Regions:
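GHKL/Bergerat-fold ATPase module in large chromosome/replication-associated machines
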Residues: 114, 132-154, 174-179, 183-674
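GHKL (Bergerat-fold) ATPase N-terminal catalytic module, capturing the glycine-rich phosphate-binding loop
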Residues: 1-187, 191, 199, 222
Length: 674
């Protein structure tokens, strides 16, 4: 019995029980080792003309014996001598593959891709096996050698027999464990089934470059006997057939010109379990200091659980065609969590078990490039296939808005131009850039209204007032919309016609254009303004003068109305935004009525101490109702002022989609007027 060199049983226990968290990856590791062995022989044949090799014969074979409780992984690769068995398997964490890569670094070409690097993958076999036997015959040698160990104390190496070069790794599986206190137990029998092994091969090693073969059970109809009568019923028989389980060449490593869209669609649907074709397919290859392939998909519709806390984002991460992580969330920002796909790179730094990644600059560089590619593709869809983009935005636009809101506006530069909102003027979805291009020359802000439906917003007096002045209003109907705009604060519109400070500068520019010069453009910072909040600064000088005069003349009326309404409003004032309606509710400060409603819709309602919107009751001084208020004030009719104040406030709330605090009293007041 030979002892494991330099490392103790404690270290082996660490390898088996601590490094790996998922026992089923033992098959991935052993198949990767077999692939490396075949790669080494393939490389040797390229360097040494005397090595005669038929590429079509190179393969890996997996088999099992349920009665003997064994799984065998065989390859016809380069094999190992007794010395190599001693060095590679007798010394824990010694990687023959890493040594091979180092020794042949300058000679290796694109035809060899060694997977192993740490020298511990082989020992994952002891997670499921009570005994491991390795039979190996090195290429060019006449004698095979057998390495055996139970993973406890040491190992033996003896002479053996094998018909040709290559290696057999034979695992004797552990017995099933007994139920623990939680009623759980590891059942190793699951690895002793055809379906169990096939599914593991296809999950983790589907794109290993060599055929992974298994004898599989099939059924076929027996030949019909020549003397069979009319009442003959077909008979069937079971048989075994050698079948290649893996796909070998991954679709993301094929040249784009060699793959049809239908092939991408089928790969997407089968891999990511979707019934619909993807809306977009993004395939690219990166070279340089960091080399990788990426194949990304934008789904045609949102997964049912996309916005639930249980949804997991991430791309499948492969290293040298071997699956490392099914969902690597570090490769996608949260606002692109809907993207599905694959990244394959041999350059990312893995941890020793290859189950997870080490935090490294390579991964961040890949993620940054992936993000840019997704953004560019979405921009292309927005500009060249608007119908498809609007459908995409209907499915996934909420996430883009959350990307801006959750980053406190830091991601606005990347995402703002991907957003779409309904234009009250154009009656269609438009981008912020399109809104800016359609503005009158004197417009200095982007106007919006927030609520639960476009139909209701379009009828709001404050919206109509802005539209009547010739300015468009964006109608925001998702709960995150206004929070997103508040996080952005402004939108920088690029290549806008330059605004000149004085007539002389403007006239000089106009003359230059007339003489053939290009019109001057500038980036314009446009504030995002809620039409129901604050001063929109849209009134003309004459309108401002009229409002000031009306305010001064009716200070006593406004004071009486404020007293009647109490702390429901901050103040009562003359409106500069109304044209037809008698009154409206606006707000001062950062919290609008709509934002207050959204916060109150939370699972526990409005939290204690949550600030409320600072409401203002604005009156249209040109409306007949205002004249009645003035008359009541002059007559000293405080009861009527109180009644009218309550009615105007409650009807303004109804227009905003908010029920009066006392609907019964409101109905009674309306009936009394009738």
């Amino acid at each position: 019995m030979r002892q494991f060199k330099t490392e103790s049983k404690k270290l082996l226990d660490l390898m088996i029980n601590s490094i790996y968290t998922n026992k089923e990856i033992f098959l991935r590791e052993l198949i990767s080792n077999a692939s490396d062995a075949v790669d080494k022989l393939n490389f040797k044949s390229l360097q040494d003309p005397s090595v005669k090799l038929d590429q079509g014969d190179l393969a890996i074979r997996v088999s099992f014996d349920k009665d003997a409780r064994t799984i065998t992984i065989s390859d016809n690769g380069i094999g190992m001598t007794a010395e190599e068995l001693e060095r590679n398997l007798g010394t824990i964490a010694h990687s023959g593959s890493e040594e091979f890569k180092t020794e042949n670094a300058e000679q290796q070409g694109s035809d060899v891709d060694i997977i192993g690097q740490f020298g511990v993958g082989f020992y994952s076999a002891f997670m499921v096996a009570s005994h491991v036997k390795v039979v190996s015959r090195a290429y060019g040698e006449d004698t095979a050698h057998v390495w055996e160990s139970d993973g406890l104390e040491g190992y033996t190496i003896e002479d053996g027999e094998r018909a040709e070069h290559g290696t057999d790794v034979i695992l004797t599986l552990r017995e099933n464990e007994k139920l623990d206190a939680d009623g759980e137990a590891e059942t190793y029998d699951r690895f002793l089934t055809e379906w169990g092994l096939k599914s593991l091969i296809q999950q983790y090693s589907n794109y290993v470059r060599y055929p992974i073969q298994m004898m599989v059970s099939k059924s076929r109809q027996k030949p019909k006997p020549e003397d069979a009568g009319d009442d003959y019923k077909p008979e069937y028989e079971d048989y075994q057939e050698l079948e290649t389980i893996n796909s070998m060449t991954p679709i993301w490593k094929k040249r784009i010109s060699d793959v049809e869209q239908k092939d991408y669609n089928e790969f997407y649907k089968s891999t990511f379990h979707d019934f619909d074709d993807p809306a977009r397919t993004i395939s690219f290859h990166a070279e340089g200091t960091l080399e990788y392939d990426a194949l990304l998909f934008v789904p045609g519709r949102a997964p049912f659980d996309l916005y639930s806390k249980d949804y997991e984002k991430g791309l499948a991460l492969y290293s040298s065609n071997v699956l490392i992580m099914e969902k690597c969330d570090d490769l996608l920002p949260d606002y692109y969590n809907f993207v599905r796909g694959v990244v394959d790179s041999a350059d990312v730094s893995l941890n020793i078990s290859r189950e997870t990644l080490q935090q490294n600059r390579q991964l961040k560089a890949i993620a940054k490039r992936v993000e840019k590619k997704i953004t560019a593709d979405l921009e292309d869809m927005r500009d060249n296939d608007r119908e498809a983009y609007e459908k995409f935005f209907e499915n996934f636009g909420r996430g883009l808005k959350y990307g801006i809101y959750s980053s406190y506006g830091m991601k606005a530069d990347e995402l703002a131009d991907l957003l779409l909102f309904w234009s009250a003027k154009e009656q269609k979805m438009i981008t912020l850039a399109e809104y800016a291009k359609g503005m009158p020359g004197d417009q200095k802000a982007i106007y919006y209204a927030a609520g639960d439906s476009r139909e209701r917003l379009a009828k709001m007096p404050v919206v109509k007032g802005v539209l009547d002045r010739g300015y468009d209003v964006l109608l925001l109907t998702q709960d995150v919309d206004e929070f997103t705009f508040q996080a952005m604060r402004e939108y920088v519109a690029a290549d806008m016609p330059k605004i000149y400070e004085d007539d002389a500068a403007r006239e000089a520019a106009e003359k230059a254009v007339a003489d053939g010069a290009e019109p001057e453009v500038e980036d314009r910072h446009l504030e995002l303004k809620n039409v129901a909040t604050g001063d929109l600064d849209l009134a003309t000088e004459d309108e401002k003068k009229e409002a000031e005069d009306a305010t001064k003349e009716n200070e006593d009326l406004f004071s009486a109305m404020k007293e009647a309404l109490g702390d429901k409003v901050e103040k009562v004032a003359v409106s500069a935004r109304l044209t037809d309606a008698p009154a409206c509710i606006t707000t001062e400060g950062p919290l609008s009525l709509e934002m207050e409603k959204v916060l109150q819709k939370g699972p526990e309602g409005a939290p204690d101490g949550m600030p409320k919107s600072q409401r203002v009751l604005e009156l249209n001084a040109k409306h007949p109702v205002f004249d009645k208020l003035v008359a009541a004030q002059k007559a000293g009719d405080t009861d009527k002022i109180k009644q009218y104040s309550g009615l105007l406030y409650d009807q303004a709330l109804l227009v905003e989609g908010i029920l009066p605090e006392d609907p019964v009293a409101f109905a009674a007041a309306v009936c009394e007027l009738m």
